[in-house]
Amino acid sequence: MGITNEMSLEFDARTCNEGFARVAVAAFVTQLNPTLEEVADIKTAVSEAITNSIIHGYEYDAKKIRIDCAVRQREFFVDVIDYGKGIADIEKAMEPMFTTKPEKDRAGMGFAFMEAFMDEVEVESEPDKGCIVHMKKKIGIDINQYE
């Protein structure tokens, strides 16, 4: 079955926009009638992805971040896209506690949190070409599965 609804949002990569973006994504997912816990999980994962883009992708240079969201039946999909410096070693970057900015007191837990709160997380990136974090979460139970 195809996508039943989509939303895209583009904004400046500024820390003051992180809260706006996570609330916009939360508002979009409400059409699936998620639990408060599911909404909190999504907001946390999106927040981590946006923060990674701002700090690591752009190093606080306020270029654009795009978020694409979609719902299909009871599944929620969100992509957080930046056009920053990219990730040279995705596997290493996704290791818990790995950080490229230890002097900034970064814990290196962003991807670990995304993986903990979402059902699937996949990262696409090339150095100097940006990064796409694809995330998916199943919301509740698909009542159509029993028909």
Identify the meaning behind each predicted range.
Residues F20-V23, C69:
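Short, charged, low-hydrophobicity "junction" segments
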Residues E6-E10, L32-T35:
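A short, mixed-charge helix-start or loop-turn motif at secondary-structure junctions
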Residues E48-N52:
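Conserved polar catalytic motif of the HATPase_c/GHKL fold
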Residues R22-S47, R106:
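Conserved short strand/loop->alpha-helix "switch" segment adjacent to the catalytic nucleotide/phosphoryl-transfer site
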Residues S8-F20:
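STAS-typified acidic loop motif
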Residues M1-S8, S53-E147:
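Conserved beta-strand-loop-beta-strand hairpin that lines the nucleotide-binding pocket
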